[in-house]
């Protein structure tokens, strides 16, 4: 079960919360859900260079509270808060163009302290490098090393498509550390992304295991222990497994 279901949806109500938190009458629910989709699409497009990790939406009467988690919050805020004002005006215009009534929009920006431990940012980085035609094995090796330095307990990366321009599409994946998908208390961050290459579409999936959390408790911010300098050792190269034969 844990191998097939979405890792985030599997843990909703246990250790993870919904990305949109509000209640509405059945008649208004579709319109508000559409608004959430418009807000996320607009912010994702406008903040593509800010390292956007997550968008949380809350509603209170005629007010919308947005919490934006970004690796580069300065890009979102702008000089003197000009970026936030532009976002509010742009969101108001976008929502009104689709028939939504005017609402008060409040934006709170939170900095992502460990960008290399966020599955969304890792998947986006892999896709960007694939579009620049860099060898996928080199990309995956560098991403795994960065994630391990960020203090994650496990990471799994899966790439599918015409890898390195091959004639036949295939799926390859690699894993370092633990990824306990069946354990509900395991804090697993999952993300997928698409790379538009000259050879076609390549799909990227990333699982990041950040530790275990007891139900009802907040996830503590993990601190990366300071490591003493040591002699350089021979690093084991990640191994890849080809799933194309199994899936066929």
UniProtKB/Swiss-Prot annotation:
UniProt domain KH type-2: residue ranges: 39-113
Gene Ontology cellular component terms for the protein in this record: cytosolic small ribosomal subunit
Comp. bias regions, Basic and acidic residues: 238-248
MF terms in GO: mRNA binding; rRNA binding; structural constituent of ribosome
Family as reported in the entry's similarity comment: Belongs to the universal ribosomal protein uS3 family.
Highest taxon of source: Bacteria
Entry-linked PANTHER family: 30S/40S RIBOSOMAL PROTEIN S3 (PTHR11760), SMALL RIBOSOMAL SUBUNIT PROTEIN US3C (PTHR11760:SF19)
Region (Disordered): 218-248
SUPFAM superfamilies attached to this UniProt entry: Prokaryotic type KH domain (KH-domain type II), Ribosomal protein S3 C-terminal domain
The UniProt record lists the keyword rRNA-binding: yes
Signal peptide from the UniProt entry: none
Gene name of the encoded protein: rpsC
Keywords tagged on the record: Ribonucleoprotein, Ribosomal protein, RNA-binding, rRNA-binding
Name of protein: Small ribosomal subunit protein uS3
InterPro entries: KH_dom, KH_dom-like_a/b, KH_dom_type_2, KH_sf_prok-type, Ribosomal_S3_C_sf, Ribosomal_uS3_bac-typ, Ribosomal_uS3_C, Ribosomal_uS3_CS
Pfam name, any one: KH_2
Matches recorded under SMART domains: KH
Role of this protein: Binds the lower part of the 30S subunit head. Binds mRNA in the 70S ribosome, positioning it for translation.
A GO biological process held by the record: translation
The keyword Magnesium is annotated on this UniProt entry: no
Assembly information from the UniProt record: Part of the 30S ribosomal subunit. Forms a tight complex with proteins S10 and S14.
